[in-house]
């Protein structure tokens, strides 16, 4: 029992108070996203009576504008700071989503989608950069892992809450959804008011920041290629193409699909921090290669399930498959953002995070488009191609390992702060050198001067 208790205590990430405030805001934000995003097309199509194509265009505009505004957001982060950028992005998101209840015409929805899209474009670079700025290298893996776990928890709970609130029979129920979503963004802004601004980079150094410098970092750019491939071939296929595939080929109901994705949420929430802990001291690119290998295997397992099983048996097997896939997500999540933060020079952190966001957005733009095209022609080709792409990304991760700087090659071991025991510090009375009774001997050093550097040092930020 003591061993179990000690292990659970070791999972405590021991993060600064400011980081916990950001994580709390992240929970609120993901809760709001879960409340609205799954029901946005339903609202536009069935409540506002827009065509399906028009409704889809509005949702696509959210991602498209975010893709365009992402590079600008990276510059803004490096110029005025991550916290200010994040607060501005949240204000745009609140205004954009908060205005949807007043939509009556498609052009109004597109305008609001553009406003929210600009907010989306700035949110991820601002959020990720702020976490990196307020943590040391040793704390970042835990901070980003906690963010991933809480985001999944918030989105899952939000989706459940949204499903219980929204009904097309009562159009005003969607007004409540959008109001709650806007409220979560505003709540995050309030929490950020209590987060100290990170140490500013000197203006002379900030002025030298260019995207050209980022693009010349070949190791980082190839890392982003690997990330984009994994997002397109794994994340996008599982989140968008898996549901229609298993519904058509394995007779899995909507309820069964919901159970499968609930397993995904539970596993990530439960396993992210323990896996991050287990990865301390491990090579990051090998961990990323392992994640790619897991994604490849699960794509093949999804194909086999669709071909050979159906109904309840398919749901049971797919739950196990998605549980394994979720472990791959945890491995990927424990490596990606901390590695990007460690590769980025301090004055280019926002730009590096913006490029990372663009890699994800490109993956989610290309993945569903290619996936649905292949699904219509040959489901087997879809999942075989996805598995092959994930395997190629795994090999690419191993080939890239030699290009990663040694200081960033391994996941740092978390700094362990010993528990504070009661201690009396004896103070030695020493005589001044100019005292007439002095023998001329030098004063002895204070005992505290040889104490652990943890005493009185402050948290190091990078």
PLM regions with names:
Residues 1-17, 195-229, 414-435:
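Juxtamembrane intracellular "pre-TM" segments in multi-pass secondary transporters
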Residues 67-104:
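Conserved MFS/SLC helix-loop-helix module at the cytosolic interface between two early adjacent transmembrane helices
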Residues 69-81, 270-285, 375:
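Helix-to-loop junctions at the C-terminal end of transmembrane segments
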Residues 84-99, 182, 287-303:
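Structural signature of the two symmetry-related core transmembrane helices
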Residues 112-153:
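Cytoplasmic helix-loop-helix junction between adjacent transmembrane helices
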Residues 163, 183-201, 396-401:
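C-terminal membrane-cytosol helix-exit motif in multi-pass small-molecule transporters
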Residues 287-332:
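C-terminal transmembrane helical hairpin of 12-TM major facilitator-type secondary transporters
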């Amino acid at each position: 029992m003591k061993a179990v208790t000690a292990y659970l205590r070791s999972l405590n990430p021991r993060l600064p108070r400011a980081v916990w405030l950001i994580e709390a805001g992240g929970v609120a934000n993901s809760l709001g996203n879960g409340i609205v995003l799954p029901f946005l097309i339903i609202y536009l199509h069935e409540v506002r009576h827009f065509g399906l194509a028009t409704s889809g265009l509005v949702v696509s505009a959210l991602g498209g504008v975010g893709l365009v505004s992402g590079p600008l957001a990276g510059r803004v982060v490096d110029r005025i700071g991550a916290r200010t950028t994040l607060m501005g992005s949240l204000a745009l998101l609140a205004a954009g989503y908060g205005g949807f209840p007043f939509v009556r015409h498609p052009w109004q929805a597109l305008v609001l989608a553009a406003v929210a899209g600009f907010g989306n474009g700035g949110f991820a670079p601002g959020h990720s950069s702020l976490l990196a700025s307020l943590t040391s290298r040793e704390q970042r893996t835990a901070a980003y892992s906690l963010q991933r776990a809480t985001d999944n928890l918030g989105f899952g709970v939000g989706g459940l809450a949204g499903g219980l609130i929204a009904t097309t029979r009562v159009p005003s129920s969607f007004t409540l959804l959008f109001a709650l979503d806007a409220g979560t963004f505003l709540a995050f802004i309030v929490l950020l008011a209590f987060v100290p601004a990170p140490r500013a980079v000197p203006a002379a150094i900030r002025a030298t920041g260019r995207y050209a410098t980022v693009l010349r970092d070949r190791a980082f750019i190839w890392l982003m290629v690997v990330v984009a491939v994994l997002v397109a071939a794994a994340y996008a296929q599982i989140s968008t193409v898996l549901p229609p595939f298993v519904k058509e080929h394995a007779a899995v109901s909507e309820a069964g699909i919901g159970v499968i994705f609930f397993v995904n949420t539970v596993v990530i929430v439960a396993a992210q921090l323990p896996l991050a802990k287990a990865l301390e001291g491990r090579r990051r690119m090998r961990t990323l290669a392992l994640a790619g290998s897991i994604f490849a295997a699960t794509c093949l397992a999804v194909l086999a399930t669709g071909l050979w099983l159906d109904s309840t048996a398919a749901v049971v097997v797919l739950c196990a498959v998605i549980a394994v896939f979720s472990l791959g997500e945890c491995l990927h999540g424990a490596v990606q953002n901390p590695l990007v933060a460690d590769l980025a020079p301090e004055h280019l952190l926002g730009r590096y995070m913006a490029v990372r966001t663009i890699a994800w957005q490109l993956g989610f733009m290309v993945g569903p488009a290619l996936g649905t095209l292949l699904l219509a022609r040959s489901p087997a080709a879809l999942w075989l191609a996805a598995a092959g792409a994930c395997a190629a990304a795994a090999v690419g991760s191993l080939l890239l390992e030699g290009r990663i700087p040694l200081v960033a090659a391994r996941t740092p071991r978390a700094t362990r702060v010993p528990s504070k025991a009661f201690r009396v510090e004896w103070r030695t009375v020493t005589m001044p050198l100019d005292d007439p009774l002095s023998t001329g001997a030098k004063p002895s050093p204070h005992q505290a001067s040889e104490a652990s550097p943890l005493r009185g040092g402050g948290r190091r930020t990078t």
